Amino acid sequence: MNVIEKAGASLRPNAFDFERFRLRRFVESLGAAELETRDAPMDLAGLAEVMEGNTKAVLFRAAGPERAELVGNVMGGRARIAAAFGVKPHELMNEVARRLRNKPEIVEVSRAEAPCQAVVLTGADADVTKLPVHLQHGADGGPYISSSIDYVIDPKTGFTNVGLRRLMLRSEHETGVDLVAPSDLQAIYLANAAAGKPTPVSFVVGAHPIDHIAGVMRMPVDELGIVASLRDAPLAVVKCVTNDIRVPADAEYVIEGYFDEKGHREPEGPYGEFLGYYGAVKRNPVFHVTAITRREDALFQTSTIGGKTLGRTDTAQLTALRTEISIWHALQSAVREPVAVYSTTSSGGSFNVRVAIRQRVPGEARNAIGACMGALANCKNVFVVDPDIDIFSDEQMDWAMATRFQPDRDLIVMSGMRTLPLDPSLPPGSRIGAKAGYDLTWPFGQGDRLVARVPAPPKFIGKRFDSVEAALRDGPKYFEELMTAVGSRDGREVLRILGGLRDKVALDRDGEGRYFIQQNSTGSK
């Protein structure tokens, strides 16, 4: 991915609309069907209950004693994420894949121009306990900033890495950050700590949904470029106040700081995880806050994670889209014609994956299953269907499982595979588990049989023949086709004609139930 870098001054005047990709503007664009607004003052302790299981994003106009503005569950519905990209929900994955091929353009602007640095707090004033951070789950280790996007520079490449992270507040100027799972940030932190160097990090809180999608992508490139590519527009960035990390200039809040060079760790958690259960207490690095910058009218953001209604959470929706992109790429080399991919959000966005393919050669359904299992550790159950099944429909998937699946023939189980340690069904401490593939396709070459056809109301598209006999001499036809061929809107007159034809020609039916005139039958019997 080649990144075009330009100096901001070369694009003046008024080169950037810092409102176009602003979180506040996106929230304001949502209609009543997608946004619930709470104008009345509300204690921070009550926020989580309002958002739990909510199908809408929720905007609180007066949260906590500071009466702060806060929005949550912005990405908790696929329709809202699709709206951020300007497409319909079923078009989302393909649109993201298309934009990832864009050549990114990044423009650095001055600190004076950057809206995210309109207010700058450093030293003792950089107090994270003054932010509207709430307790999300009853047994959490403390209030969490759950919607932060981390920006860190990889010292080996000079690239900026972008990811999604959670911050557990420890004090006015310290947070815990979960770095147990393998990630680019973990690798950068461990390398710096081994060399006795601190790791500067900046966290953006309050970002457009597109930037969150960039945060879940993991690619060996400068990931500021992914933000720019997905925005489908030049990205304005600014250097932070207490480090040289560049972040989007249109962010709502930025929290700057570092992990110390000694690799000091403290207990972090427990926390309600994205699979719907609690994660245990872990020893994680301490993040030391050096600055908080924000817009004049900054909008704070929180993300929904965990609980029984996983499918309505930010984390599940974001994870699902990342899973779909990864699986789609893996399928390109595994099968000739992948049609669609959907990762169910009720499984956390990654454990249950549905794939539709058009089989061109025998065995492609199993190839698809193998590709999915190998593409991601947390892809646990793979369901492959023919393209006539709508993979976004639970009803149709249930029907395919009931009518096209034989367990002794179509179930593939693979054991000893790398998996996600957070899976609560695994033995404690295990990183190896089993995966299952469900081939819900018709056996190759059998999908065109009559018994594989789905009954549907007849369709009549216009007369093509002058008589039923002429239509039959054209080739075997179903009764519906005979009606269409002669322009019948009733069908009973066709029955009468067929009755008369039986006395004239050798009229018969084939194994599929189609009417036909036997070859060399030209006259009366």
What are these regions (language model features)?
Residues 465-473, 495:
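Hydrophobic residues on short alpha-helical segments
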Residues 2-270, 274-286, 290-460, 481, ...:
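Extended, highly charged
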Residues 470-481, 489:
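Short capping segments at the starts of secondary-structure elements
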Residues 488-500:
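Short amphipathic alpha-helical interaction segments
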Residues 403, 470, 484, 500-503:
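Short basic/hydrophobic patches in alpha-helices and adjacent helix-turn junctions
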Residues 331, 372, 471-472, 498-501:
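Hydrophobic C-terminal alpha-helix "anchor/cap" residues
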Residues 35-36, 477, 507:
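Conserved hydrophobic residue
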Residues 499-525:
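Charged low-complexity interaction tracts in eukaryotic proteins
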